[in-house]
């Protein structure tokens, strides 16, 4: 890569930014400034029409198109302002990881919603096997429509990882328990190249469920969105206990430039990608959206 410490160059300890108070569902607010201030933006290649609205569809940085306002309503405006990027650090690392996925690779996207990462995987991996899991029926329909729009074939399953202590899903959600390990067995999936998870507070429950897969080294890379500071570091601890190393991390309270924290991991024997700093939102000067 060569840019493992790139984001650290922007850190200024004299700056002390509080975390934006709202999630995407509550409106953009300071969230746009944080996303656009992420140094990872500078390392993401953008296609020619990235961020443009063409025939009612927004062009993402990787040439994937999605209907305007299809991602948390007005929050989709970040795709226009930020030239097709909505989660800079995560998208930076996802793009890097894709370089190491072989033909016939498999992705399981938990909490897939609009299926962004699944579609991207499918576009880059020859003969990709794509599995999308989403608890909310309306969100799942959004993902299906996006896949159709981008000529992507994917296997969709409605279900959620159970966690009584987690955040409650939307009214259209399926409350039936979803277990990743059981799913892998039912679908006869021999190896998971990317397990991508954004499951609203149930991430540690999910990781405990897949310990047998971790022990057997059945997962090449994990992308885990974290939803509290405690959960973030508990997820890291569990992964490291089972011989997975952290290749990128931005915690929930201080480091992430997005509302969620992010952990990217692979088995310790996999040395393809060195540890990469994702910077620190709290100590990075924010870029005003009026500068765009």
How does the language model describe each region?
Residues 139-142, 165-167:
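A short beta-to-alpha transition loop/helix N-cap that caps and shapes the active-site region
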Residues 128-130, 219-222:
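A short, structure-level motif marking secondary-structure boundaries and short turns
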Residues 136:
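Conserved SAM/SAH-binding beta-strand->alpha-helix loop
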Residues 81-108, 155-217, 223, 229-230, ...:
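Short internal loop-to-helix segment that lines adenine-nucleotide cofactor pockets
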Residues 114, 139, 201, 228:
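Acidic, metal-coordinating catalytic cores used for nucleic-acid/nucleotide bond scission
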Residues 1-133, 141-145, 152-155, 185, ...:
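S-adenosyl-L-methionine
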């Amino acid at each position: 890569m060569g840019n493992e410490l790139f984001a650290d160059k922007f850190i200024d300890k004299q700056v002390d930014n509080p975390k934006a108070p709202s999630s995407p569902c509550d409106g953009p607010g300071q969230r746009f400034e944080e996303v656009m201030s992420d140094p990872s933006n500078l390392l993401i290649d953008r296609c020619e029409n990235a961020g443009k609205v063409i025939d009612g569809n927004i062009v993402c940085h990787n040439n994937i198109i999605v209907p305007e306002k299809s991602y948390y309503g007005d929050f989709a405006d970040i795709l226009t302002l930020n030239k097709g990027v909505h989660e800079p650090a995560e998208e930076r690392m996802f793009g890097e990881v894709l370089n190491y996925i072989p033909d016939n690779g498999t992705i399981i996207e938990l909490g897939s919603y609009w299926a962004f990462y699944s579609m991207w995987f499918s576009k880059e991996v020859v003969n990709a096997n794509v599995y999308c899991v989403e608890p909310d029926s309306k969100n799942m329909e959004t993902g299906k429509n996006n896949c159709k729009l981008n000529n992507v074939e994917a296997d969709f399953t409605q279900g959620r990882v159970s966690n009584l202590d987690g955040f409650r899903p939307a009214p259209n959600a399926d409350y039936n328990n979803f277990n990743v390990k059981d799913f892998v067995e039912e679908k006869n999936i021999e190896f998971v190249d990317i397990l991508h998870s954004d499951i609203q507070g149930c991430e540690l429950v999910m990781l405990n469920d897949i310990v047998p897969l971790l022990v057997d080294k059945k997962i090449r890379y994990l992308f885990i969105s974290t939803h509290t500071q405690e959960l973030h570091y508990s997820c890291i601890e569990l992964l490291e206990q089972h011989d997975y190393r952290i290749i990128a991390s931005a915690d929930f309270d201080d480091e992430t430039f997005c509302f969620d924290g992010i952990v990217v991991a692979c088995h310790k024997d996999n040395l393809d990608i060195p540890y990469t700093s994702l910077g620190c939102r709290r100590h990075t000067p924010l870029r005003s959206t009026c500068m765009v």
